Amino acid sequence: MKVAVDAMGGDFAPQSVIEGVLQARSEFTDLDFILYGDQAQIEPLIDDMTRLTIVHTTEKIASDDEPVRAIRRKKQASMVLAAQAVKDGQADALFSLGNTGALLAAGLFIIGRVKGIDRPGLMPTLPSINSDQGFNMLDVGANAEAKPEHLHQYGLMGNFYAKDVRGIENPRIALLNNGTEATKGDELHKATYQLLADDPDLNFVGNVEANDLLKGVADVVVTDGFTGNATLKAIEGTATIVMSQVKHAIMDAGVKEKIGGLLLRGSVGGIREKFDTSIYGGAVLLGLKAPVIKAHGAADARTVYYTVKQIHAMLANQTVQKVIDYFSDQAAQKNSN
């Protein structure tokens, strides 16, 4: 199994990318890596080239580049070459810490979407206070608008991922809505609710409100990209602010408070670990013909390692192939009827 790596994507590339890949290489001996980027910057970071190949290019896509234009014009960019390798069968998966929009465009226009999937969805794994496994939510920004059929497909794809990668036997699928009752929401959410509820292949548990997301009430939460992106940023922002306020409240206080802070250090550390999303890896662009993973631009080597772990699980369990087979069977059944 081979992974195409955009070694130049991210705030700390290529160092954080290479360090994470080297950690993953030590554990996953059945993975090979093709590193796309500036050879002069990459080589000094590697002592042993076992199962590593460098494809040299100095062109890269910047964080402020217009996504589709960058993919079309920067043909030799590290991200574009990595995506092309997956399309050509030279690699089985792609991951990058670079420009999110550009990676979405590369995945869609170069690698291509699964036949039967109308719109791929971007899906991260988020923390839950009641579980170390967290929960998946999609879409969080690949598509601003959606139809009920799209959200239904997100539920199906998320179901496969939760089973294969997270090891959940019967994932609970929920719909993000403004109330838990079946009649809540606009026409999009009402129609989506019915599609999810009527699907015998899904363990649909109904609507979930945003204030219950972190309580672990579902394993996969389905939403449109606009709502999902806003919700994701609210969760990330809240977690950052809360931990920052706790730290400053202790450090800026008097001696008694600092002593109390020392006594609570273990508990505070546990909370920090609970909201440490690096252990979940990156966000998966589900609905493409191969695994495509986007990790945060500021990700460190630890996050890169867990992202590769994600990819390994998807490849070993043939998650994408299961999605392809499922939607192919669905299309065949429709045609026979």
UniProtKB/Swiss-Prot annotation:
GO molecular function: phosphate:acyl-[acyl carrier protein] acyltransferase activity
Cysteine-cysteine disulfides: none
One matching Pfam family: FA_synthesis
Reactions catalysed, as given in the entry: a fatty acyl-[ACP] + phosphate = an acyl phosphate + holo-[ACP]
Major subcellular location class: cytoplasm
Superkingdom of the organism of origin: Bacteria
Key words of the record: Cytoplasm, Lipid biosynthesis, Lipid metabolism, Phospholipid biosynthesis, Phospholipid metabolism, Transferase
Biological processes per GO annotation: fatty acid biosynthetic process; phospholipid biosynthetic process
Compartmental location: Cytoplasm
GO cellular component: cytoplasm
Keyword presence, Coiled coil: no
EC number, UniProt record: 2.3.1.274
Pathway it works in: Lipid metabolism; phospholipid metabolism
Annotated InterPro entries: FA_synthesis, Phospholipid_synth_PlsX-like
Assembly behavior: Homodimer. Probably interacts with PlsY.
Function, as annotated: Catalyzes the reversible formation of acyl-phosphate (acyl-PO(4)) from acyl-[acyl-carrier-protein] (acyl-ACP). This enzyme utilizes acyl-ACP as fatty acyl donor, but not acyl-CoA.
PANTHER family listed in its UniProt record: FATTY ACID/PHOSPHOLIPID SYNTHESIS PROTEIN PLSX (PTHR30100), PHOSPHATE ACYLTRANSFERASE (PTHR30100:SF1)
Protein family membership: Belongs to the PlsX family.
Protein name, as recorded: Phosphate acyltransferase
Native organism: Latilactobacillus sakei subsp. sakei (strain 23K)
Gene field: plsX
